[in-house]
Amino acid sequence: MAARLCCQLDPARDVLCLRPVGAESRGRSLSGSLGAVSPPSPSAVPANDGSHLSLRGLPVCSFSSAGPCALRFTSARRMETTVNAPRSLPTVLHKRTLGLSGRSMTWIEDYIKDCVFKDWEELGEEIRLKVFVLGGCRHKLVCSPAPCNFFTSA
């Protein structure tokens, strides 16, 4: 089952939001099979229009009508190249959630914001998405049992 989404920049919060196609939004439509998940629990997020979506690896707040709290995401190809050159990005994020990293995350956020629009708008990379929550989001990722805890914020 595929979910059809739009990518929209929210300048008020300076975050990228995913919106189901058909909801009020602007941005490039995304389409891809990202795996199946169970819908988020009603108590976890506000009333939403995402219970029909089949997505893996998104925080439950992604399904909220208000959009995700503080979500940054990029293509899997990018995560395998420049960002990962000096170190593993998941390891860096995991250390940050534990309060172990003293390095600012601004360089990662800037890099991701730069490459998201190039990859999606110019290259059309829509299917192989990897999701990273870089802070400010209290929701856990919706994913199958696996070592996903390093993608959640503290």
Swiss-Prot record:
Region Disordered, annotated ranges: 25-49
Database matches in InterPro entries: Transactivation_prot_X
Region of interest (Mitochondrial targeting sequence), residue spans: 68-117
GO biological process terms on file: DNA-templated transcription; symbiont-mediated activation of host NF-kappaB cascade; symbiont-mediated arrest of host cell cycle during G2/M transition; viral genome replication
Keyword DNA repair included in the entry's annotation: no
Highest taxon, organism lineage: Viruses
Role noted for this protein: Multifunctional protein that plays a role in silencing host antiviral defenses and promoting viral transcription. Does not seem to be essential for HBV infection. May be directly involved in development of cirrhosis and liver cancer (hepatocellular carcinoma). Most of cytosolic activities involve modulation of cytosolic calcium. The effect on apoptosis is controversial depending on the cell types in which the studies have been conducted. May induce apoptosis by localizing in mitochondria and causing loss of mitochondrial membrane potential.
UniProt-recorded name of the protein: Protein X
Gene designation: X
